[in-house]
Amino acid sequence: MADLNKLAEDIVGLTLLEAQELKTILKDKYGIEPAAGGAVMMAGPAAGAAAPAEEEKTEFDVVLTDAGANKINVIKEVRAITGLGLKEAKDLVEAGGKVKEAVAKADAEAMKKKLEEAGAKVELK
């Protein structure tokens, strides 16, 4: 197992020129074609890979950050959205937090709009 870890460290430590040479050797000598994007690209910084994932986000959590001055209307909207009872909705509004999890973008934006019209401050995460 130590040999595999060393091999992985060596591969990650390759310069771009060395990685290109490795690709050529694997292709010519062993007939191994790189996958789309290539193994060379996988050695790049993780931050570059994280950016596209954020753009493709399709599910959001609707988070209540502040109930505002008109808590009664916010409680009514929370009950309508979640189906919670009066006490549970009131507790959620007073404590703040996730109103709904893993909601489609369009639905999350609609919920946010309704809650903001009722006087709450809402974030989509």
From Swiss-Prot:
Keywords: Ribonucleoprotein, Ribosomal protein. SUPFAM superfamilies: ClpS-like, Ribosomal protein L7/12, oligomerisation (N-terminal) domain. The keyword Ribonucleoprotein applies. The keyword Ligase does not apply. Pfam families: Ribosomal_L12, Ribosomal_L12_N. GO terms for biological process: translation. GO terms for molecular function: mRNA binding; structural constituent of ribosome. GO terms for cellular component: cytosolic large ribosomal subunit. It comes from the Bacteria. CDD domains: Ribosomal_L7_L12. InterPro entries: Ribosomal_bL12, Ribosomal_bL12_C, Ribosomal_bL12_C/ClpS-like, Ribosomal_bL12_oligo, Ribosomal_bL12_oligo_N_sf. Belongs to the bacterial ribosomal protein bL12 family. Homodimer. Part of the ribosomal stalk of the 50S ribosomal subunit. Forms a multimeric L10(L12)X complex, where L10 forms an elongated spine to which 2 to 4 L12 dimers bind in a sequential fashion. Binds GTP-bound translation factors. Forms part of the ribosomal stalk which helps the ribosome interact with GTP-bound translation factors. Is thus essential for accurate translation. This is Large ribosomal subunit protein bL12. It comes from Cereibacter sphaeroides (strain ATCC 17023 / DSM 158 / JCM 6121 / CCUG 31486 / LMG 2827 / NBRC 12203 / NCIMB 8253 / ATH 2.4.1.) (Rhodobacter sphaeroides). The lineage of its organism: Bacteria, Pseudomonadati, Pseudomonadota, Alphaproteobacteria, Rhodobacterales. The gene is rplL.
